[in-house]
Regions:
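Short Pro-Cys-Gly-centered "Cys-loop" motif that presents a nucleophilic cysteine in a tight turn
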Residues: 1-47, 51, 61-215
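Structural motif
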Residues: 54-56
C-alpha cells in the first residue's frame, strides 16, 4: 500500500474467512482507540464504519507528517508526490495489536483479518499535482455514503444513525465524537454543517452510492 500526502483513500478489511472481528461493545471502542493512537497522527479521518466482521475508513493523508517519520531522499522529480511508507506499517501495527487482544479474549490463535488491507485511492485530491479535470467529488461522496449505508445494506438497521459504530451520528449531531475531521469533510463533500442531515438524504436520493470506483 502506497499512501500519498493530500490524497483521499478508502481503507477496508474484513475478518479472515469472513469471521467476526468485533465480539462486544468494548471491542469496537478498543479498536477506535487503537486507530486514534496509530493512524490519526498521519491522516484525517473523514468517515468510518465498524461492522461485526469488517471495517471501512475514508481518510485524507496529511500534508505534514509527524517529525518521527523518517524523511525520504531529497532527490525527487519536479511535481513528484512521494508516498508515506510508515502508514502501511502503522495499519499493520493496529491490526496486529488488536488481533493479539482478541485472541487472548476469545482463547483463539491465528490471524483475525484477511492478509491484505485494501486501500483504494479516490481520484479527488487537494494536492496541486493532481490530474487536471479530475475533481473526484462524486467518488468521495459515493464512498462517504457507501460507508455509512453498510448497516442498512446488511440489514442491521433501518437508518444510518441507529448504528452507533459509525461516524454518521457525529455528523448528524447526535454525538460529539472527535475522531473525524468533520470540518474537512464538510469542505470536501460540500455539506453544510447546520443542515447536514437534510442534505445527506437529498444527495443520497440523487445518486448511486455503490460506485465501483470507491470499493
Amino acid at each position: 500500500m502506497n499512501f500519498e500526502p493530500e490524497y483521499i483513500y478508502h481503507i477496508y478489511n474484513r475478518g479472515n474467512n469472513r469471521q467476526k472481528i468485533f465480539f462486544n461493545h468494548e471491542n469496537y471502542l478498543f479498536f477506535l482507540r487503537k486507530v486514534r493512537k496509530e493512524l490519526l497522527p498521519y491522516m484525517d479521518i473523514l468517515a468510518y464504519c465498524l461492522m461485526p466482521n469488517h471495517f471501512h475508513f475514508l481518510v485524507q493523508i496529511k500534508a505534514k507528517q509527524p517529525q518521527s517519520v523518517r524523511p525520504l531522499p531529497a532527490v525527487r522529480r519536479i511535481g513528484e508526490v512521494r508516498p508515506v511508507p510508515v502508514i502501511a506499517r502503522k495499519i499493520g501495527t493496529l491490526l496486529s495489536s488488536y488481533t493479539q487482544a482478541i485472541n487472548k479474549q476469545q482463547h483463539r490463535t491465528g490471524s483475525l483479518f484477511q492478509q491484505k488491507t485494501k486501500a483504494k485511492r479516490l481520484t479527488h485530491s487537494t494536492h496541486p499535482t493532481a490530474p487536471s479535470g479530475q475533481t473526484g467529488f462524486d467518488y468521495d461522496l459515493a464512498c462517504f455514503h457507501y460507508i455509512h449505508r453498510n448497516p442498512i445494506d446488511t440489514g442491521l438497521t433501518k437508518k444510518p444513525e441507529e448504528w452507533v459504530y459509525s461516524s454518521f451520528r457525529d455528523y448528524a449531531g447526535l454525538r460529539k465524537g472527535s475522531l473525524c475531521n468533520k470540518e474537512l469533510a464538510y469542505e470536501i463533500l460540500h455539506y453544510d454543517k447546520e443542515s447536514f442531515y437534510e442534505q445527506y438524504f437529498v444527495k443520497f436520493s440523487a445518486g448511486n452510492f455503490t460506485h465501483p470506483q470507491c470499493i
